[in-house]
């Protein structure tokens, strides 16, 4: 595999994983408040 392909896959994985994480953090902050 090329480094470019690996880089694109890692970026996509981070974006997909960051979605639910951001929602969870916002929900946790609202819950704490």
Swiss-Prot record:
Function: A core subunit of photosystem II (PSII), probably helps stabilize the reaction center.
Keywords of the record: Chloroplast, Membrane, Photosynthesis, Photosystem II, Plastid, Thylakoid, Transmembrane, Transmembrane helix
Keyword Chloroplast: yes
GO biological process, one term: photosynthesis
Protein name, per record: Photosystem II reaction center protein Psb30
Gene Ontology, cellular component aspect: chloroplast thylakoid membrane; photosystem II
Ranges in a coiled coil: none
Topological relation to the membrane, as annotated: Single-pass membrane protein
Disulfide links within the chain: none
Subcellular location: Plastid, Chloroplast thylakoid membrane
One matching Pfam family: PSII_Ycf12
Lineage, broadest ranks: Eukaryota, Viridiplantae, Streptophyta, Embryophyta, Marchantiophyta
Transmembrane segments: 5-25
NCBIfam families: PRK13686.1 (NF010239)
UniProt entry tagged with the keyword Thylakoid: yes
Record family assignment: Belongs to the Psb30/Ycf12 family.
Subunit and interaction comment: PSII is composed of 1 copy each of membrane proteins PsbA, PsbB, PsbC, PsbD, PsbE, PsbF, PsbH, PsbI, PsbJ, PsbK, PsbL, PsbM, PsbT, PsbX, PsbY, PsbZ, Psb30/Ycf12, peripheral proteins of the oxygen-evolving complex and a large number of cofactors. It forms dimeric complexes.
The organism's place on the tree of life at top rank: Eukaryota
InterPro entries: PSII_Ycf12_core-subunit
Gene: psb30
């Amino acid at each position: 595999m090329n480094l470019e392909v690996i880089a694109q896959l890692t970026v996509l994985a981070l974006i997909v994983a960051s979605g639910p994480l951001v929602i969870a953090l916002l929900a946790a902050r609202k819950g704490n408040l």
